[in-house]
Amino acid sequence: MRFVIVTGLSGAGKTQATRTLEDLGYFCVDNLPPKLISKFAEVCTQSGGNIEKVALVIDIRGGIFFDDFFEALNYLKKNEFKYEILFLEATDEVLIKRFKETRRSHPLSPDGRVLTGITQEREKLREVKNIADIIIDTSKYEIRHLREKINKNYGDHTYPEKQLSITVLSFGFKYGIPVDSDLVFDVRFIPNPFYIPELKQYSGNDEPVKDYVLKQEETVNFIEKLVDMLRYLIPNYIKEGKSQLIISIGCTGGRHRSVAIANEVYERLNKENYNSKIEHRDVAEDLHKGEKKL
């Protein structure tokens, strides 16, 4: 089990680091009192392998417990429990700017100057910084830079293609574009099986419609170009630290063309070992639109 303790200066990026670790599959706990660290570690080891990656955030708001923190670390060492400490920091100037932008007071100086709180906190955390395994100065970092750094140090690089969760989603434009889409593709230029009497009753999940749609020259060319583009985009999304990608493919009603094409794109990505799933938002809409609603 990988056990990461995240700490550092207020305003240095602990919240964003925690979110990134969560996206990487870590079970994250924020502001656990240091006295409970050893007990928490025991619970994790007794999970039967269900918990493989843990990130525990220790904030200066628990500053009165820092003696307990070092006692907990000694306990972990004595019991041969492996842990890593990630320490985040930034310059005084950058931290002051961040506090002013968020209009927050410093936790160690709620009624005074932000700089006073930063100075006190830096001194309190000196010993923790000295024993940290990784120190990240976020002074010149944008969020994406921090995500990249966290991913580089704590991501699973054995199967990098699994780091991005991909959803291929079919939909009908007449029911609206999915609001959480990252990429939207319009396949209404492809011949519509809806106007072929013997195909109208089926959906893109059924062989007759699937065969008709996928044999169209427009479909063949579109899928090849789309998959080729995704092969370029996905590794770059992973490198940037993106954790989820929703690829929405739409036709008029979301029942025939978009369903067949979304299924094919999903199968292609699946064969290339990407962490992908398929959803059909509107495939049944036309079947039920005539039913009376409660």
From Swiss-Prot:
GTP binds at D59, I60, R61, G62. Keywords: ATP-binding, GTP-binding, Nucleotide-binding. Transmembrane segments: none annotated. It comes from Clostridium beijerinckii (strain ATCC 51743 / NCIMB 8052) (Clostridium acetobutylicum). GO terms for molecular function: ATP binding; GTP binding. This is Nucleotide-binding protein Cbei_4857. ATP binds at G8, L9, S10, G11, A12, G13, K14, T15. Belongs to the RapZ-like family. It comes from the Bacteria. Displays ATPase and GTPase activities. The keyword Metal-binding does not apply. InterPro entries: P-loop_NTPase, RapZ-like, RapZ-like_N, RapZ_C.
